[in-house]
Swiss-Prot record:
Residue interval(s) of motif Integrin binding site: 199-201
Principal subcellular localisation of the protein: virion
Family: Belongs to the herpesviridae BMRF2 family.
Keywords: Glycoprotein, Host cell membrane, Host membrane, Host-virus interaction, Membrane, Transmembrane, Viral attachment to host cell, Virion, Virus entry into host cell
Membrane protein topology class: Multi-pass membrane protein
Any one of the GO CC terms: membrane
Signal peptide, first to last residue: none
Known function: Facilitates virus attachment to oral epithelial cells by binding to host beta1 integrin family. Participates in rearrangement of cellular actin to increase intercellular contacts by binding BDLF2 and thereby promote virus cell-to-cell spreading.
Keyword Transmembrane annotated: yes
This protein's name: Protein BMRF2
Length: 357
């Protein structure tokens, strides 16, 4: 049994790791909303808006780096992250022309920020389920704070409102070591120690073993993703569902997707129910979008994604349970979830940019 102090300490650490894991999405969101203006800076706008799918893809690529090399990158990464954010802060305050320097700064810092979701998730999803919820809460809260800053135009008024970004980096990077030292985490890691012929210190699931253990979960997630992508295309063309949402939807997709959803009961039943609700909501929007009005149409369209997130959360939780004996089970979860984020954010970019409703 673990003490209450250990649980509280780990809960605080993983909450801060949630704040840290949000930083690549927040970085993209801030640039896409403050510096994107298609009339005056067309190529910069495309760079910033493509940042969301790029961040998802880079987070997946970081999972291919061995753990010991990823840990060694922490100190240089955090120093460069803070330096880049300070330079951006200075440019916003003191410079009137950022049409070249800002995109270069954005592209230089983004790959390093994408290291944090890998390091955070690798720790969090070895811990008990209650601590995983603290992580997801931290990630969702961080995304919500910056979304509200943009909605209220606070970021446009003053660069001071970038300060939470520095706080997230400082708290999160400082919590990495604390979470690793916690006895609850180390005991979870111990349960994944390899026995007999497995390579390395801990059991690692190969691609073949992952496909063998979770074929139907992966197939169901793929089917749900294809369904919602088709819904996005049809509703964009016929109902103009992205009108007024294009500024906020990528952050919502990344934040809510990575944070999971509500999942109770059997994963396959939840997935079927959520797929049915997605289909029904899309049919209502398709046929009644003029009757519903802008608000009703937007609420129903967003609810389609909420249902999808809940279905995928149930399926990914089932996958994590099947891979609980393997130390790289959390990384499999990250690859699946962030590839779904990549598909949605890239699809949203293509629809809004090239396919006019």
């Amino acid at each position: 049994m673990f003490s209450c102090k250990q649980h509280l300490s780990l809960g605080a650490c993983v909450f801060c790791l949630g704040l840290l894991a949000s930083t690549p999405f927040i970085w993209c969101f801030v640039f896409a909303n403050l510096l994107s203006l298609e009339i005056f800076s067309p190529w910069q706008t495309h760079v910033y808006r493509l940042g969301f799918p790029t961040a998802c893809l880079m987070a997946v690529l970081w999972t291919l780096v061995p753990a010991k090399h990823a840990v060694r990158a922490v100190t240089p990464a955090i120093m460069l992250n803070i330096a880049s954010a300070l330079i951006f802060f200075s440019l916003r305050v003191y410079s009137t022309s950022t049409w070249v320097s800002a995109p270069c700064l954005f592209l230089a810092n983004l790959p390093l920020l994408c290291l944090w979701p890998r390091l955070a998730i690798e720790i969090v999803y070895i811990c008990p389920a209650i601590h995983q919820r603290f992580f997801e809460l931290g990630l969702l809260l961080a995304c919500t704070i910056f979304a509200l800053s943009v909605v209220s135009r606070a970021l446009e008024v003053s660069a001071v409102f970038m300060s939470p970004f520095f706080i997230f980096l400082a708290l999160g990077s400082g919590s990495l070591a604390g979470a690793r030292r916690n006895q609850i985490y180390t005991s979870g890691l111990e349960r994944r120690r390899s026995i007999f012929c497995a390579r390395g210190d801990h059991s690692v699931a190969s691609l073949k073993e992952t496909l063998h253990k979770c074929p139907w979960d992966l197939l169901a997630i793929s089917a749900l993703t294809v369904l919602v992508v088709c819904v996005m295309i049809v509703l964009h063309v016929h109902a103009e569902v992205f009108f007024g949402l294009s500024r906020y939807l990528p952050l919502f997709l990344c934040g809510a997707m990575a944070s999971g959803g509500l999942y109770l009961g059997h994963s396959s039943i939840i997935a079927c129910v959520m797929a049915t609700l997605c289909t029904l909501s899309s049919v209502v929007v398709y046929f009644l979008h003029e009757t519903l009005g802008p608000l009703g149409k937007t609420v129903l369209f967003i609810s389609i994604f909420v249902y999808y997130f809940s279905g995928v959360a149930a399926l990914s939780a089932a996958m994590r349970y099947k891979l609980k004996k393997f130390v790289n089970g959390p990384l499999v979860h990250l690859r699946v979830v962030y590839m779904c984020c990549f598909v949605f954010t890239f699809c949203e970019y293509l629809l809004v940019t090239f396919i006019k409703s």
